UniProtKB/Swiss-Prot annotation:
Belongs to the YqgF nuclease family. One of its GO terms (molecular function) is nuclease activity. Its main location: cytoplasm. This is Putative pre-16S rRNA nuclease. InterPro entries: RNaseH-like_sf (IPR012337), YqgF (IPR005227), YqgF/RNaseH-like_dom (IPR006641), YqgF/RNaseH-like_dom_sf (IPR037027). Pfam families: RuvX (PF03652). Its EC number is 3.1.-.-. One of its GO terms (cellular component) is cytosol. Could be a nuclease involved in processing of the 5'-end of pre-16S rRNA. NCBIfam families: RNAse_H_YqgF (TIGR00250).
Amino acid sequence: MSAALSRDATLLAFDYGEKRIGVAVGNLLTRTARALVIVRNLNREHRFKAVGELIAEWKPDALVVGLPLHPDGAPHEMTQRAMRFGNQLNGRFNLPVNWVDERYSSVEARAGLRARGDAADRVDAEAARVILQQYLDGLPDHHEFN
């Protein structure tokens, strides 16, 4: 899915997991991302109510979802679940969704939290931050969101 975004567009990113969904927020102008919250993935109703509240609060222009893959790049069971989640986000909230290869994002998140002395229970939100920062870092200077 693609759409041109303004230079100061706000993005929400998600690290989808069976028990928890890490969420991060970022901005195209500053090209920075920060860990936001962790949504407990209790059931579909709870998941989308919580995400809907975040979307209402942050008013993102687009969403980024981490795509879990095996180290060799092959998809696995969680790949399909994350894709379904992203497609549901697009359908429910009518926002463009972009995918980011999230291999090793949790490893990087844990290392970053340890280095800063932050709580390990924030790893899912920090992984979402890593995913979003990877996305932002990969954008060309004259960006058209895609």
